[in-house]
Curated annotation (Swiss-Prot):
GO cellular component: plasma membrane
Organism: Ureaplasma parvum serovar 3 (strain ATCC 700970)
Chief subcellular location: membrane
Protein role: Required for the insertion and/or proper folding and/or complex formation of integral membrane proteins into the membrane. Involved in integration of membrane proteins that insert both dependently and independently of the Sec translocase complex, as well as at least some lipoproteins. Aids folding of multispanning membrane proteins.
Intracellular or extracellular location(s): Cell membrane
Protein name: Membrane protein insertase YidC
Presence of keyword Membrane: yes
Entries under InterPro entries matching the protein: YidC/ALB3/OXA1/COX18, YidC/Oxa/ALB_C, YidC_ALB_C
Top-level taxonomic group: Bacteria
Pfam families given in the database record: 60KD_IMP
Length: 383
């Protein structure tokens, strides 16, 4: 082969390589562009969903306070009530389920899907109430309110499945934030006395880089809180307006439509005193469901906790917030219908189990990761 042919072959190979590299770069640019577009669309979708849930939650909250027909009543056939239509064909022919007026006081029945009471009741309360209503009717002969207990557990599982991804993401993000608390404390200490704009920007940049490095989304833990508000209102309204629940007494002791604190003060010597035991069961379990995830997180991240403890003022604020939440939850359980307390009891048990399972999974992953690292070091002759 002559030198001219060799030169031509070399030039062709260079052109081919440059074309291949250009095509590869173009493909990578396209992929990166698609990824950016997908991330933007995902963020917009999340904002719309969370704004919707927050809006519907606030709407339901204000509606419950403002509209006269949302009045609660423990009296059968009174207040806002949801049940079956009174009809030989459509109805259940059972006074516990068919909507029949008591004859006194205001009464606002809801037997069919309708927007007459607003979108909150039509789109959220109605579907959940129908599941519980039909399940309780199918198991209406069960004794001691066992059908109501199992029905509430089914509702809890449905809601947990729907919100599983959000709650799991919030838990993982909280875990990641706990793991980098020590490094965050170091950044805060580094710029403790810095007041100029440049130093503040550097602090923000370092914190942002730390979050990106560990894939931390600081606002992710608050996502579950946005979903929690409408869910609480939905369950609250289902328990307080569902007609058959007004006939249920758990183990023939606790009336699900009654308010524990009212029963204790109004009928202590007769039916009120058992509600003390109701609160002594529900409230401690609810508090444990708040404390156990924190204790497990501390156990997983002892180093982060030790470093973070240097900032005693911040630690005090966190503990104070936790105590306030625990007190608020206890008060809400005491002043709400017993059905709410029962639902929260099962929810608390589920939260404790979920926290323990997540703890075991994380510890196993860390153990496996440490084993792999030790194996690689051993292969390199480092031990």
């Amino acid at each position: 082969m002559s030198s001219v042919d060799k030169q031509n072959l070399t030039n062709r190979m260079r052109i081919s390589v440059s074309h291949f590299a250009g095509a590869s770069n173009a493909n990578s640019i396209k992929k990166e562009r698609k990824k950016k577009i997908f991330n933007v669309l995902l963020k917009v979708f999340k904002i719309i969903v969370y704004a919707f849930f927050l809006g519907i939650g606030l709407y339901g909250c204000f509606q419950n306070m403002a509209n006269h027909w949302t009045i609660n009543s423990t009296i059968v056939g009174n207040g806002f009530e949801l049940g079956f239509h009174v009809d030989p064909i459509l109805g259940a022919n059972d006074i516990r389920f068919d909507l029949i007026y008591s004859g006194t006081g205001p009464w606002y029945p809801m037997s069919d899907f309708s927007f007459d009471y607003g979108p909150f009741y039509a789109l959220f309360v109605w579907p959940i109430a129908q599941i519980l209503l039909h399940f309780m009717y199918a198991t209406r002969d069960w004794p001691a309110g066992l059908n109501a207990i199992l029905g509430l557990i089914i509702i809890l599982l449905i809601i947990r499945v729907i919100t599983m991804l959000i709650s799991a993401r919030a838990t993982i993000q909280t875990e990641r934030i706990s793991e980098i608390q020590g490094k965050i404390a170091e950044i805060n200490a580094k710029y403790k006395d810095a007041k100029d704009m440049q130093s503040r920007q550097k602090k923000q940049m370092e914190t942002k880089e730390l979050y990106q490095k560990h894939n931390v989304k600081p606002l992710a833990p608050f996502e579950s809180m946005i979903i929690t508000l409408p869910i609480f209102l939905i369950i609250y309204r289902v328990v307080t307006i569902l007609r058959p629940l007004k006939f249920i007494s758990i183990f023939y002791i606790w009336d699900l439509s009654a308010t524990p604190i009212s029963e204790i003060f109004s009928n202590f010597t007769t039916s009120g005193w058992p509600y003390i035991f109701f609160l002594l069961i529900i409230i401690p379990v609810q508090i444990l469901s708040q404390k156990i995830p924190q204790l497990l997180a501390r156990k997983r991240n002892r180093n982060a906790t030790t470093v973070g403890a240097k900032n005693k003022q911040q630690l005090k604020r966190v503990r104070m917030t936790q105590n306030i939440i625990a007190i608020v939850l206890a008060v809400v359980v005491a002043i709400s219908a017993s059905g709410i307390g029962l639902y929260w009891f099962f929810n608390a048990i589920f939260t404790i189990l979920q926290s323990y399972i997540i703890h075991v999974i994380i510890m196993k992953r860390r153990s496996n990761s440490a084993t792999r690292i030790e194996s690689k070091l051993a292969k390199l002759g480092i031990s």
